[in-house]
């Protein structure tokens, strides 16, 4: 019976490690959603010269909808830079990404279309670099989290035996 308890302790610790490791994917999910938004904005502004509020109304992303980001930016047709700033605060991401999004929002809707397109491109480049950096470290971090949880489970099982 003790061995069964030890085995269950190790397995449950490993499962907890898997769940924690999967939680690390959220950082990458945020960047992917923002990249989709900026790519969509770039395409629609470049090709069709659509106003920003229409772009936000027509864009859909499950993650950005769930955290309330898109609802916030859709809430106003005027003063998008202020609405953008409050929507950016909803994003659970690191300071570097938030600062870049705030800088983008300061000129949102104010710049001429050509300059706005260039600003979107700069932000896309930043997000792509950030995504590459995160995804490169993510696999190793996930593997480490699972290993540490497994070792903790083994240590607990040994102590209990």
Task: Locate each region found by the language model.
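Acidic, low-complexity proline/glycine-rich segments
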Residues: 1-6, 91-94
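Bilayer-spanning, highly hydrophobic alpha-helical transmembrane segments
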Residues: 5-16, 135-161
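Juxtamembrane/interface alpha-helical elements of multi-pass membrane proteins
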Residues: 5-74
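Non-transmembrane, amphipathic alpha-helical segments
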Residues: 22, 26-29, 93, 108, ...
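Generic structural signal for well-ordered, non-transmembrane alpha-helical segments
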Residues: 32-35, 39, 64, 78, ...
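Membrane-anchoring/interfacial helices and their immediately flanking loops
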Residues: 70-95, 157-160
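Short, non-transmembrane cytosolic segments of multipass membrane proteins
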Residues: 84-114
């Amino acid at each position: 019976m003790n061995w069964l308890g030890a085995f269950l302790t190790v397995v449950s610790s490993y499962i907890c490690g898997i769940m924690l490791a999967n939680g690390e994917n959220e950082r990458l999910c945020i960047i992917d959603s923002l990249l989709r938004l900026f790519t969509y904005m770039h395409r629609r502004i470049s090709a069709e010269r659509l106003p920003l509020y229409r772009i936000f109304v027509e864009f859909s992303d499950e993650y950005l909808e769930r955290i309330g980001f898109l609802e916030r930016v859709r809430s106003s047709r005027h003063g998008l830079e202020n609405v953008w700033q409050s929507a950016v605060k909803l994003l659970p991401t690191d300071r570097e990404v938030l600062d870049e999004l705030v800088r983008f929002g300061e000129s949102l809707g104010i710049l001429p279309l050509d300059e706005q397109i260039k600003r979107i491109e700069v932000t896309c480049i930043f997000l792509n670099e950030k995504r590459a950096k995160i995804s490169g470290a993510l696999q190793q971090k996930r593997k480490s989290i699972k290993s540490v949880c497994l070792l903790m489970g083994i240590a607990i099982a040994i102590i209990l035996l």
